[in-house]
Amino acid sequence: MLSPERPSDVPRRTVLTVGGVGLGALLTGLASSPAFAVDTATATVPAEQAATSAAFPVPDSAGIPPGPAPFGWNPVDLLDFDPATLPWAKHLRCLVPRATRIEPFAPTQAHPDLDPAVQLSTLTRYDAGSVYGARPQPIGLEPWAYTQRYWQYIDVWGTWHGVVSHLTPDELVAKPSGTAGRQGAVIDLPDPQWVEAAHLNGARAIGGWFWPRGGVDFNGFLVQREDGSFPVGDKLVEIRDYFGFDGLFINQEASITATQVGKLKELFRYIKRIDPDFYLQYYDAVLPSTGSLSYQNVLNERNVPWLGTPEEPVMDSVFINYGWYSGPDPHLTTSATTARAHGFDPRQVAFAGVEHQKGIFNPSERFGAVAGPGTPAPTSVGLFVDNQFWWTKALSGEAASIEGRAGLRDLEQRFWSGPTGDPHTSGRTVAFSSGRQDVWNYQRFDGVAHWITERSPYGALPIVSSFNVGSGAGFWLGGVQVRDSGWNNQGSADRALSWQYWSEGDLAVRLDETVAYEGGHSLALTGSGVLHLFKTDLTAKGRMPVRVHAQGLTSVEVGVTWRDAPDAVDWHPLVGVELGGWRTWGTSLRLDGRRVARISLRTEGDGHLGKVAFLAAPGVDRPSRAEGFTVSDAGDVKAAEGTRHLSFEWQLADGADAYDVLQVGTEGVTWLGRVRRDVFFAESVDLTRGRLFTVRAIGRDGSYSAPVHARLA
């Protein structure tokens, strides 16, 4: 059900022919070139540009999304889990393995004296800005929904908010939050788009366990067989394996009996025994000996038993409640001492909670007092609702327009990179006074980059980025606009840049949603200077082809920082060729087996950076075709005649990193979506534009397979 404040018209998927380029040129060109094929004049500003706060999408107002949607479980339905009978199960899987991150290398850190052992966990509102709160929509038409682009700092991402059980009647799910019977489930399946994005960047992604929940018998979780196994434990491991996430955040926040808490510990110990990679983080709430709710605000002898022992763990870590700074452990030394006394590394097992849901840029917890460049933190840190700024602003309509989202992306940059927006100059510029006051003043917050070193998955070539953050008001392929309406799918985003944005000289950088080379965004550059892009650990004996697509720039150079000479940057000029509205800059660098520790660009002129690629070899590593491509009708759209929901399936292709699905019409093609699995649900497809569809596999170097077609009967 739509809120009366939300526009009732269905977002359009317009077929475009841009700069005279139609179906043949687009598909043939993209299939024959490694990531950089069709270049044409810049397209029109997307239709989303005109959105205003007068009629905006109201967060958590629309009930159940069409098609796939993650949900929650309680014991009665958890034990009945069977993917063969679960609607849309294949659409909720993450097939992306968790990337390996390179080892720390201090000379190329934004802060060389920042301790890389300090970790970061987050509890993030998965639905910030989305109209779907009861059950999130993994792929949708919502450019106003938040997507994370600072994965380089996150070690453990956790879902927050709570989703409604799939056994709850639809009419109740569609009711406002708090309605009697609209009950959140105990165990939340994490939204697969978040899991995919986390894994691409080497982070863990965990679901949620939320207690109390009304109408649920807690003892149902604690049933134990005679052989010592737990049916719920077996089923949780099965579910994690099928859906591809990494574990659970245990928010056990109501007292239970001593007998129950003893069984609960045994359940978690059993899970860790049969699946050591099942990551469990416990919130500092219920005590492990008595079952009583008692926030300790410190890791101490009362709650440390939740960790078990190094040889037989119960939990992997504890999220320490927020009262540590004004309470028993202001310097976190007691927590660190307790962890070490029990054989644990405190940075691995103790995460000091910081409450951003209320504090935003000025939380009461001052982790920066015990952490920062030159100050090794005793423990790691956990952020509660790091994206609260987006949720709050979305409630007043600020996320509904491109201009509004630009402001929110700027706030996001200040949150993660510090008040200057540059991670190598992070650190608060206004002294701390009282927490949870003046919460929108970003000068009061250090920025996460002041506490946590950037992590990197860039240990091998190719490295390709078009600065796609997994949402946008339009979509472009090769400089051609092939969609002029909004979309979101965080799982389709590129891997995060290592720094956003570490620049030198008078260069200013911002994320721009009005134009792109591929995806939904580009980087707008003003002035001249250096932009550091990727922290790497690369070794190659041959050459590294370099390709850069940009508009308006008069000069582009690529800079290599060698690991054996980290104090200097080795600069190489790129040669540009004008093709329509984008200039392709390129060169080929000889690496000769030396280790590359960082890749940077030096530019002159105002313009846009659309795509960068650092390739493994001169040839194209094209993926195989996505065979077995089919399309089926998945339901009508009541608000628009001739518009249908569609479901697509195909076989995974060798060498494929992702897949683009497009609609083919007489006027051109329309991009429907990009996914990293073998199924795709497309919402609200206008069939008057055509009933022929195509899928193309995309390789790691950005090259495209030959298209495979299917027609809707």
Predicted segments — roles?
Residues 46-141, 145-148:
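N-terminal module-boundary/linker segments of secreted carbohydrate-active enzymes
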Residues 506-530:
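Short carbohydrate-recognition loop motifs
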Residues 644-654:
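Conserved aromatic anchor
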Residues 685-704:
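Beta-strand-rich modules
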Residues 113-334:
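Chitinase-like catalytic core of GlcNAc-active glycosidases
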Residues 1-10, 19-38:
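N-terminal secretory signal peptides
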